[in-house]
A protein has these predicted regions:
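C-terminal catalytic histidine-bearing segment of alpha/beta-hydrolase fold enzymes
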Residues: 2-12, 271-325
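N-terminal cap/lid segment of alpha/beta-hydrolase-fold proteins
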Residues: 24-98, 223
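Short beta-strand element of the alpha/beta-hydrolase
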Residues: 99-108
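Catalytic nucleophile-loop/oxyanion-hole region of alpha/beta-hydrolase
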Residues: 115-122, 135-173, 302-309
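Primarily recognizes the serine-hydrolase "nucleophile elbow" in alpha/beta-hydrolase
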Residues: 157-224
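Mobile cap/lid helix-loop segments that gate and shape the active-site cleft of serine hydrolases
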Residues: 213-249
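Acidic catalytic loop of the alpha/beta-hydrolase fold
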Residues: 217, 264-268
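Short beta-strand/loop motif that positions the catalytic acidic residue
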Residues: 253, 259-261, 265
Length: 325
């Protein structure tokens, strides 16, 4: 892995990536944490940092050197609403990438963070190697009222920006695959309900790849934090579960779906993915589920464990079914 003997602080302090460095993990000041002074080799021993972070940072440097990589939507769409939402552009070197859907990548973080460091840049680098252009979305978190509605607006703003700049990015703006992790996995699923693409008159994704996603409010039977529910949904959880926030009950608008998770997930019950898969099967929507025997929550690119290479398998599956679509 590149930079394995460099500290995280030195790598994120590189002036080339100054606009994005503070959002390596949005809403966390990493410079105040012990991991700031750890090398990437040392970080790999910690579960949530086990992926190929060095490859992601190397690819980020390469993108930054082009000068055509970082797009704060508050600036580019001239919106009076200041949200801090932005996309980072990782183009693939594959000449056929222009003809393929781009990947719209949404890292997770429990709706309080956005983990670009592990679930954004390294994953985008892998999709680039598979011949796909990638946009990485950094979205609003820590909302106090209807955050998920705001996140759907984040999606719409980003996708409209991309569609409006097809020539600049050498792609077809109406052809895209969504991929999201954990909370980001919930968002890419929610985008396929009536709250998502249809509400914004935007095209349906070609496919969706949720990775260890939350999908169901009814599965979360623990004690409810009313402030959290109001911040996410604008209502209490029981009321939200009667709406399309309960994704398996509103799955008719989904594209083909490939789900990836680990059996030993300690944070998100694997039943979230299985429940969605059963709902898609009832709708006769193509779906596969890959459940790793190990890896837990937050395995990201799956390096060093049984989930390694899942991005390639997702693409291979998508290409196998797209030939028949």
């Amino acid at each position: 892995m590149p930079y394995e003997n460099e500290t995280l602080g030195k790598l994120l302090g590189d002036p080339r990536i100054a606009p994005i460095a503070n959002d390596a993990i949005r809403n966390r000041d990493l410079s105040r944490e012990p991991l700031w002074n750890k090398t990437l080799a040392q970080l790999k021993t910690e579960h949530f940092f086990s992926g190929e972070i060095g490859l992601g940072i190397q690819r980020l440097y390469q993108a930054a050197e082009t000068g055509n990589w970082y797009f704060p939507l508050d600036k580019y769409d001239h919106s009076p609403e200041k949200t801090g939402t932005h996309v980072v552009w990782f183009p693939s070197d594959d000449p056929k990438a222009d003809e393929r859907p781009f990947v719209f990548l949404v890292p997770g973080g429990g709706f309080v963070n956005v983990w670009n460091l592990t679930e954004g840049w390294p994953i985008a680098e892998q999709y680039n190697r598979h011949g796909y252009h990638v946009f990485i979305l950094t979205y609003q978190v820590n909302g106090r009222d209807r955050l998920l509605e705001n996140n759907m607006r984040d999606f719409a703003r980003a996708l409209r920006f991309i569609r409006g700049n097809e020539t600049r990015f050498h792609l077809r703006g109406d052809q895209y695959i969504t991929c999201g992790f954990s909370a980001g996995g919930y968002l890419v699923c929610l985008w396929n309900t009536e709250m998502g693409y249809a509400a914004y008159d935007l095209p349906k994704p070609q496919a969706v790849f949720p990775v260890y996603p939350v999908t169901s409010l009814k599965l979360n039977r623990g004690k409810e934090n009313k402030d959290t529910s109001m911040g996410l949904y604008g209502c209490l959880r029981e009321e939200a579960a009667a709406k399309c926030y309960e994704i398996p009950e509103h799955a008719e608008g989904f594209p083909p779906c490939a789900l990836f998770l680990a059996a030993g997930d300690e944070l998100v019950n694997p039943e979230h993915s299985l429940l969605l898969a059963r709902a898609l099967d009832k709708q006769h929507i193509p779906c596969i589920v890959e459940v790793g025997a190990s890896g837990g929550h937050g395995f990201a690119d799956g390096s060093g464990m049984c989930m390694a290479g899942w991005t390639g398998r997702a693409i291979q599956w998508y290409e196998s079914i797209s030939d028949n679509m």
